[in-house]
Amino acid sequence: MTPATQLSARWNGLLPRESLERLDATEFLTRCRQGIASRGVLERFLVQQYHYSRHFTRYLCALLANLASEADRFALTENLFEEMGLGGMGEVPHSQIYRQMLEAFGLEPSAQPPLAETTSLVRNMLRLCSDSDPLVGLGALCLGAEAIVPHVYQQILTGLLSAGFPEKDLIFFPMHIDGDDEHALTMKQIIERELTERPGKRDVLRGAAEEIIEARRAFFAALTVSEAQAASASRRASGAL
């Protein structure tokens, strides 16, 4: 049984197994698992992930705006507070922790603008989370992001450590490997209740999850394409000397 199959099973089939397997099969995640991802492509990931993740509170607020239940909004507000450094996972905003990590590695996001695939991922997540049907936003943000963060980040952390990035500077990843599963389970409870009331909406939920996971797959694929293009440009420049 593949890790993607195991994860999907733990979520009672809510997570699209085929989409997860395609995500795991990307060259980037494969290299991370094998411990052979280059430092260059990992640095590219860290910067592009910043361009995506800095909008996380916008994604969450968009979803919150479409939840009719006050209890549901209250439950997810805890996630928002933690992102802002006001919850139980620490007193520093997560965006600041990420920036500190980039600074430790000498990476400046403004020097590497978002790739087209990164911009597409951001726009798709915002669009789906803003949908008037909360199951669309839950499919994207829960099933397409929070629920798979521990699974994906563990692979990336393996790649970062194998490439020699100091563990002391990588606290952002263990924090989310340990913490995001709880956030996802909070959303899962909302999803299960919504599906009990509206069982015909299961395909809507799954479609949103598949769409955002595919956008994430394209995001990962672009990292190694960019690496190959950079290597090709370097060879051409060397040949011209």
Which residues does each predicted region cover?
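Non-heme di-metal
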Residues: M1-L241
